[in-house]
Amino acid sequence: MELQTIPNNISLANGDSKGVQLTFKNIVYKVDNKKYKKLVKKQEKAKKKNDTESSTGDMNTGVSTTIEKELTILNNVSGVIEKGELVALMGPSGSGKSTLLDILAQRKSTGKITGQLLVNGKEIGEAYKKYCSYVTQEDVLLQTSTVFETLKFYADLKLPGVSEIEKIKRVEQIIEDIGLTKRTHSKIGGVLPGGILMKGLSGGEKRRVSIGCGLVTNPSLIFLDEPTSGLDSVAALQIMKTLLNLTLKGVTVICSIHQPRPEIFALFNKVMVIIKGKMIYSGSNILEYFESLGYPCPNNTNPADFCLDSAVEIGEGERYTEICNQWQKIWENELLNEIEYPPVNVEKPKTASWGYQYWILLGRTWKDFLRNQGNFVARVGTAVVTGLLFGVCFAGLKETEADVQKILGTIFFLITGLNLTPFAVISLFLSGRTLFNAERASKIYHSFPYYMAMVTVETLIVFLVALINAAICYLFAHLRWTAGHFFFAIMVYFFVHLLSDFMISTIANLTGTSDMTFAYGSGLSVIYMLFAGFYVPTNELPKSFGWLHWVNPLFYSFVSLVVNQFEDLPLECTRPNIPVGNSTIQIPCQFSNGNQVIEYYGIDDWTRGSSFGVVVAWTVFFFWTSYLALHFLNKEKR
């Protein structure tokens, strides 16, 4: 079976021969050996216990010399990829093919890397990223966006200096190139947060959209990690034909791939094989080369399977080092005859401003919220239902001493209800984080504009939920209804809901799983509710637990609302008169005005403004903890 041969003089669709040659020389990649670290700790403990140095280890560390400090994943890997080639990067699991792909795409964020990476024979540093694009194995796309909107989003953020008309033309051309013209305005689809299924594209079509996202910047190099993984045979072949068509326009495509079917394997015009971190072959005549090594391909055998099986056999055999050295010499000789290309323009890629990023992200986030109708209905519907339930349960309250406890209960349960509401959208936080990680790894936008866009939309939703919930309850329960008191109460409920949102978001970004977020969040919320000042007044709490009031945002929320409700409020005493001899006397009331209620709960030192200020401060605190956790703890490690 012969591999495809693409001529070197292919021109692009726009007539500009912008293809580039990629050369990588002596790539070495090492990572820390965890076993080594464990051994160091173990022997350090032994030293302290015995107060003597281990006789079997290094003189300085006491570490056994049979365990290396670093593991070598790639060892002097070199190769040349010409423009317009479709390259298969093959090898068994753990051979280092995905690692090499990440290094070539400059996406490796861990370990130590040495070697050279040249474009048209020159090192171009940071500008290298302008020429390449990377498509991950998983299709991480926003389910509620259409194909056009997805590609336009990438165009808006990655082509900031291009006019709107040119961006649209570029997107339409990409859609045509990936064969999705008839699906231009179809939604991506998939399982939305909360388990709702939205109909959309097939798996193969989603993969083509992912490839299209990588084509927005008109790259010269495209790297794909297992592009056919998880697809059926028909969809996989369609994907590879799409990639082959791109090479005909001068684009160089490098794929890591595992055991492709014969029809797919025949599309590649170069195959690179890595075994145990070393390159043992790179070229277009792999079957002939393996036959020269004594590994002829049997008839009626999948060539890809044969190559992989032969590579594994070589890696386990005695000739492994000999064959690796032999190939190194062949490569060095071929390097002398390497095709020369003109130097590339090393202009640094442009990036959109934070303000522009925020605007584009805000538009997408708002559309996503409106299209996820299940989420919208659930949140607003819950606000209406809980507001009605609270209102009916506490309906017709009066400004009397007898109803003081019911009024306090209404206020407290409104606070706790809004504090617990964010638990219903934990899946939203986590699904958004997955998309964010994938897009930030592609250098589309900075984390802060993304976060602010999410916060803006969430703030509007939170305000709506708090307004509906509190307004219904206040209307039914007849709480203090003057404009000033009602507006202040709405603002407190709004900030309670918002700070709870930020708190749950912080925990979600710290833990990364819904189960852990729910466990930690619910535990913290229970503590907040218990020490909010309703069940146990401040002046009755044991001194050893007093600090739990002062670090509790729900306490300050409760204080501000109680002061707002009862300050300078006269309370009618409705206790009955009882006969005493020939006359009657009225049982004295515990409270004759609202100030006595405030004093009874030990919060008379607080004004509604000062306590509300602390609530705002807590909201700001959780706002920043959520962002910092998102920014620093959610970076993709490869």
UniProtKB/Swiss-Prot annotation:
> SMART domains annotated for this entry?
AAA (SM00382)
**Residues in ABC transmembrane type-2 domain copies:** 374-633
Question: Domain ABC transporter, which positions?
Answer: 58-301
Q: From the UniProt entry, list the residue stretches annotated as the region Disordered.
A: 42-61
Residues given in the record as ATP binding sites: 91-98
List the transmembrane segments: 376-396, 410-430, 459-479, 484-504, 516-536, 544-564, 612-632
Give this protein's Gene Ontology molecular function annotations. ABC-type transporter activity; ATP binding; ATP hydrolysis activity; ATPase-coupled transmembrane transporter activity
Gene3D superfamilies in the cross-refs: P-loop containing nucleotide triphosphate hydrolases
Q: How does it sit in the membrane?
A: Multi-pass membrane protein
Which InterPro entries does the annotation name? AAA+_ATPase (IPR003593), ABC2_TM (IPR013525), ABC_transporter-like_ATP-bd (IPR003439), ABC_transporter-like_CS (IPR017871), ABCG_dom (IPR043926), ABCG_transporters (IPR050352), P-loop_NTPase (IPR027417)
Query: Which cell locations does it reside in?
Result: Membrane
Tell me a GO biological process for this protein.
Answer: sorocarp development
Q: Which PANTHER family match?
A: ABC TRANSPORTER G FAMILY MEMBER 12-RELATED (PTHR48041:SF87), ABC TRANSPORTER G FAMILY MEMBER 28 (PTHR48041)
State the family it belongs to: Belongs to the ABC transporter superfamily. ABCG family. Eye pigment precursor importer (TC 3.A.1.204) subfamily.
Q: State the name under which the record lists this protein.
A: ABC transporter G family member 12
Query: What organism, scientifically named, is this protein from?
Result: Dictyostelium discoideum (Social amoeba)
